Amino acid sequence: MTAPIVVKIGGRALDEAASRGPLWNALASLAREHAGGVVIVHGGGAAVDAHLVRLGMFTARAEGLRITPPEQMDEVAAVLAGRVNTLLVGLLLAAGVNAVGLRLGDAGAARCDLHRRAGTDLGRVGEVIGGEGGAWRALLRAGCTPVLSSIGFDERGSALNVNADDAAAAVARILRAHALVLLTDVPGVRGQDGGTIVELDAARAESLIDAGVITGGMIPKARAAVATAEATGVPTVIASWDAPEHLRNLAHDAPVGTRFTAGARSAPRVSLASDGHG
């Protein structure tokens, strides 16, 4: 079976989901044209923040991860696996995608445990520690597109809040994906001539940072993409949700955004998180 493409959606693409028709249509085309199908992993940090504010609950973060006290876990799961997942599945169905909404840990496809970080109590924040992805593979074989919220379960069956970027990387690793696509507000890394750089590895990315070509907010994005490619063994693509018509190029191995590959030298290991879950 051809390996699937894993697409992570978050940020403004979700905050303005109802007005993103071209994006959902492009994902429908990609799912039809790529023989291995597509798996979508989504965040929803802004929706969680707004919900917790309405409830008078405080949100704290540590190094990009949303600290999730046990008393907030049900609320976080209700928003991510309920409201956001339902909205996204509906929009994809309307675009012609055979979308099936799931939590990350459903059917044991991904095994999770509490996230271990020395000196910081993250509450019910989880991380993926293994899995076979059997349920996702079965759905892909049936012509369906799994749409995964980043809610996992520990060995006792209690819910865990997994960072969406980390969840997408884990899904790509488990499925040995053809590519992992991180949809952002930028089309990729710009070169000195203003054009998008097609491919980078750790060494070249760092040399462009040192030369002042990669600057500002693109520095953590580039380092995170390289780190993900090296950790998963899966090429990682930064592409824009504002140019979704190019996404179908992935089905034909044509350039889209900037593709990051594992190189001989590792970039600094930086969390993919930008807003906790978006």
PLM region spans:
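C-terminal catalytic "cap/lid" subdomain
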Residues: M1-G278
